[in-house]
């Protein structure tokens, strides 16, 4: 009987740790997307002479971009950022690739995060980057602690 309880406890620790690790991966992919998009938009801003542009002004009118975005709700005008006089075909593909980061993620939470973290070019501050990365290990620690508690309760 002891071994059965021990096995149940170990499986609880593994399960909780797995879900915590999955959450960390999602946060990391969001951070990478925000960082890549921010850097790209900075280059567009300097090339196009934009003073200010908001993510909420981006939309998808081109079918190629719709394919990358899937059902992700984006508003505004992407055509402003992909105007031929500003960007090459490679740069257009680059912004489409950046948007492809979000296709498999939860659209609602990422949409809210985009609106809150990137309201204009350079919108990701060092503090926000640090917060995203600081929270990451907490999920593993909490997940392991909860799993360990379940393990102790089972035994």
What are these regions (language model features)?
Residues 2-74:
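Juxtamembrane/interface alpha-helical elements of multi-pass membrane proteins
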Residues 7-16, 129-155:
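Bilayer-spanning, highly hydrophobic alpha-helical transmembrane segments
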Residues 37-40, 44, 91-98, 102, ...:
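Amphipathic alpha-helices that form helix-helix packing interfaces
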Residues 72-82, 130-135:
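Juxtamembrane/interface motifs at transmembrane-helix termini
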Residues 76-108:
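Short, non-transmembrane cytosolic segments of multipass membrane proteins
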Residues 101-145:
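Membrane-interface, cytosolic juxtamembrane amphipathic helix immediately N-terminal to a transmembrane helix
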